[in-house]
């Protein structure tokens, strides 16, 4: 769902930063 998408985006951003 949307929550999973947000979690994935957060992980990607955390990896970049």
From Swiss-Prot:
Keywords carried by this UniProt record: Amidation, Amphibian defense peptide, Secreted
Valine amide: modified positions: 17
An annotated GO cellular component: extracellular region
Localization terms from the record: Secreted
Record has Secreted as a keyword: yes
Record GO biological process: defense response
Tissue-level expression: Expressed by the skin glands.
Protein name, as recorded: Caerulein precursor fragment-related peptide R3
């Amino acid at each position: 769902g949307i929550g999973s998408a947000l979690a994935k985006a957060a992980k990607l951003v955390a990896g970049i930063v």
